C-alpha cells in the first residue's frame, strides 16, 4: 500500500491527518465502502500492511520506541501458539500478532488492548477488513483506564465497529510484544 492510496481514501493531504480521519470513517454508517476501498489497495490480507505504513509515516521510533513486530515474527508466533477460542493481544499496535494468529485460527474471537490513539484506527481497520469478531480496548492496560472500548461484530464481508460502554472480562491465549524499552518505577505504584 502506498502512502498516496491511504491519503486519497481518507481525503487528507498529510499522513499525520490519517488516524483521526480513518477512525471517523470507520465509525460512520458507510464504513463498508471505506473498507472496500482499502481492500482494493491493501494487498495480502495474510500480512499487516498497516504495520509498514505506520512505522514509515507515523510512529515515534526515537521518542516512544515504537518499533512494531515484523510480520515474519508475527507469523512464527501465530504458528507456535496453540488453538484457543479467544486470543488476547496486549500492546496490539496495528494488529500484526493478532492477524498472524487469525491466519492459523480464523474462527478465534479477539481481545486487543492498545494505548496509542494514533495506531487504534489502523488496528480497527485491520480487524474489520478480515471480518474478525472481538473487542478492542483503547487505553492503559496496567491501570485498566480506557478512553474507548470498541466492539467488532462479523458482517457479510467486513466487521462493524461500535463504541460500547463496557465489556465483560475475556479469557484466552495471550500473545504480546510490549514496549520493553519503557521505563517503570514501582515505588509509587498502588498495586505494590
Locate predicted features.
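Class I S-adenosyl-L-methionine-dependent methyltransferase catalytic core
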Residues: 1-192
